[in-house]
Amino acid sequence: MKKAKLIFKDNTPFSLDFDDFYFNSKDGLNESKFVYTHSFEWKNQENFIIAESGFGIGLNFFLTLKRFLQTTPSKRPKKLFYISIEAFYIEKEQLREIYQKLGFYEEFKELLEQFLKFYPKAKEGIYRFYFEDCFLDLVFEDITILKELDFKADIWYLDGFSPNKNSQMFDENLIFEVARLSKKNTQICTFSSASFLQKNLKKYGFRVEKTKGFRKREMIKAYLENELEFKDKEAYFSRTFSSLKNKKVAIIGAGISSAVLAYELSLRGFEIDVFEKHLELGKGASGNESGILSSLILKPKVNLGEFSELSFIEASRFYRQILDLEFKGVVEFAHNDLMQERFDTQRENVLFKISKNQAFLEEGGVIFPKNLVKNLFEKSKACIYFNHEFQAYKFENECFTLKFKNDIVKSDYAVLIYAMGADTKDFVFYDEMKLSKVRGQVTHLKPFLNTPFPLSSKAYICPVKDDLQVIGASYDRLDASLESKEEDDKQNIENIAEFIDKNTKLEIIGSKVGFRSYSSDRFMIVGNAYDEVFYKEEYKALLWTKNKEQKLAKISCNLYFNFAHGSRGFSTSVLAARYLCALINNEPLYLEKKYIHAIHPARFLIRKLKKGL
């Protein structure tokens, strides 16, 4: 990612990249209020979306958030979503210094320091920050990323530098995407009154009004007169906006994917019931004593690798923001030539500090799954029903009725979510969706290695906790045994041989078996259940029509999937939960389209139809 080159000129941040000031050098604070943050009225609605081209130093955001928080809750939206695109990275300490030099620091200190505490490294991606009733999605990408996003803004801040020095931020391509991501009466706020900007806005259906500017002759405001329709060549992956009879949600399964999802749903005011077949938490793969938070390390530009990196860093930021966890890092080792080749190609990646055959991931570390899952459920205030083994559902009158073993029935749920990990294989029967149930066994040893962070190679070693050290894990697609096996413990020990002296005697004090859920392409499966009959009929000619407009997919009910997280559920569950909440609650979709397509439940069928099979 590009680093911003800036200096102070006339006591104001000045960009050397664009030869322009970041904002008005005489009164930037009041100009931002006049042009952007105080130029519209709040609407008392569920979700209010502000999108911004050019985050800069974040002044517009902090002014907007401050105004939002100071407004009486009954006179503002329930949730504020603020989406801001920024292509030029400013270092954390430099941001703080800018606010101090401008004399803004004390005014924004609390919000700014909360922001800086979780400020990410200089790497492209979408990074979510949690504030009171507000989500900030800071998008570190070029402005062309808009074509990958999906939301309908209420307000646009068209910021950026002067149009004659940064024309890309105001050109026709940008305004096309702005129009696509707007709805009827969406308001455009901008300091500019450039004629070519007015022309582009009018071309895509905006009514343009000239108005008095801040200490100058004029500026413009614009309003979208009618929501535009655009051709969608991949409508089979596009969202269908949900309509809910109530805010009751049922989640089947009580592992990590369920716990994160329950927490995220609780932030949106949903009533959550979780059903678990076991008598307590932690009986499945999410119940290990210790585990590691880490990332796959693949070659650059590999979709699975990039998704794993984003999942990892956002999970780390989530656990730090929500549970106040601290991570000391994790060390990954290249234990064969292929892995070493991957490590060698990632030396410029800021997530990985690579030296020879080692990669240190500063944001990773040891996790304690049982405690983590328990704490998230407690924060969510979800009601957990143990000893409830799910059998079937019935959907009628826009609600689900659930049947459990022993003739237990629960009803009146507007949303049903499958999050039962490896057991999902017994309830999802699409022809093209191939799921694997993979057995894994971890071994509990008496402490034998003093390490402050996990070590991961052929197997992993966790730091000592409560006089116990966890190593693992085995991997077996063919074994369905629930019982621990001596040969698996032996294999786990053999796989950590590189870390211990050959004369070291290890004492096994226990082990635990769990089952992972995998898809055939290693991406998680997250999104709406789909109507297989409709897909096969409507998209049967995709081999010949894949470059033409497609009909929007039919969704028969609010059944959602959240499974196939493999061995990295503590990373991927965070992105999954945010994406599902966006679908259920009609929010900005949060993920880029390339990732939405990669995790979509219908992707296997669509690939087959595109081949004419």
Swiss-Prot record:
Its cofactor is FAD. Pfam families: DAO, Methyltransf_30. It catalyses: 5-aminomethyl-2-thiouridine(34) in tRNA + S-adenosyl-L-methionine = 5-methylaminomethyl-2-thiouridine(34) in tRNA + S-adenosyl-L-homocysteine + H(+). SUPFAM superfamilies: FAD/NAD(P)-binding domain (SSF51905). Its main location: cytoplasm. Keywords: Cytoplasm, FAD, Flavoprotein, Methyltransferase, Multifunctional enzyme, Oxidoreductase, S-adenosyl-L-methionine, Transferase, tRNA processing. GO terms for cellular component: cytoplasm. Gene3D superfamilies: D-Amino Acid Oxidase, subunit A, domain 2, FAD/NAD(P)-binding domain, Vaccinia Virus protein VP39. Its EC number is 2.1.1.61, 1.5.-.-. One of its GO terms (biological process) is methylation. The keyword Transferase applies. It is found in: Cytoplasm. GO terms for molecular function: oxidoreductase activity, acting on the CH-NH group of donors; tRNA (5-methylaminomethyl-2-thiouridylate)(34)-methyltransferase activity. Residues 1-225 are annotated as: tRNA (mnm(5)s(2)U34)-methyltransferase. Residues 252-613 are annotated as: FAD-dependent cmnm(5)s(2)U34 oxidoreductase. Catalyzes the last two steps in the biosynthesis of 5-methylaminomethyl-2-thiouridine (mnm(5)s(2)U) at the wobble position (U34) in tRNA. Catalyzes the FAD-dependent demodification of cmnm(5)s(2)U34 to nm(5)s(2)U34, followed by the transfer of a methyl group from S-adenosyl-L-methionine to nm(5)s(2)U34, to form mnm(5)s(2)U34. In the N-terminal section; belongs to the methyltransferase superfamily. tRNA (mnm(5)s(2)U34)-methyltransferase family. This is tRNA 5-methylaminomethyl-2-thiouridine biosynthesis bifunctional protein MnmC.
